[in-house]
Design a protein with these regions (language model features):
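Recognition helix of helix-turn-helix/homeodomain-like DNA-binding domains
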Residues: 41-55
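DNA major-groove recognition helix of helix-turn-helix/homeodomain DNA-binding modules
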Residues: 60-75
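Conserved hydrophobic/aromatic packing and binding residues within compact polymer-binding modules
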Residues: 22, 36-37, 47-50, 76
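Short acidic/histidine-centered micro-motifs embedded in hydrophobic/aromatic stretches
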Residues: 79
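N-terminal flexible/basic segments that precede or flank functional cores
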Residues: 1-24, 28-29
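Short basic helix-loop element that most often maps to the first helix and adjoining turn
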Residues: 20-35, 39, 64
């Protein structure tokens, strides 16, 4: 079984990588979680869960985050 893979949660690795990428882009843009959450019109606690890989988010939220980060959606998947 690949590292980071769990039969209970087969997408755990990808969620973590997505969250790390969002955090990296946020840090690179000099934004706090609160700042990005405000720009993306999402709850800061939900953003924290996304960045930590704890939730399966939706395309809607990924679009909001990309807009808040001022990057194309595909940039969120460049990990």
């Amino acid at each position: 079984m690949p590292v980071g893979y769990s039969s209970d949660n087969p997408f755990q690795r990808e969620r973590k990588l997505l969250g790390q990428t969002i955090k990296h882009l946020r840090d690179k843009g000099g934004m706090t979680q609160e700042g990005l959450a405000e720009k993306a019109s999402i709850n800061v606690s939900y953003l924290a869960k996304i960045e930590n890989g704890y939730v399966n988010t939706t395309v809607r939220y990924l679009i909001k985050l990309a807009r808040g980060l001022k990057v194309p959606v595909k940039a969120l998947f460049e990990f």
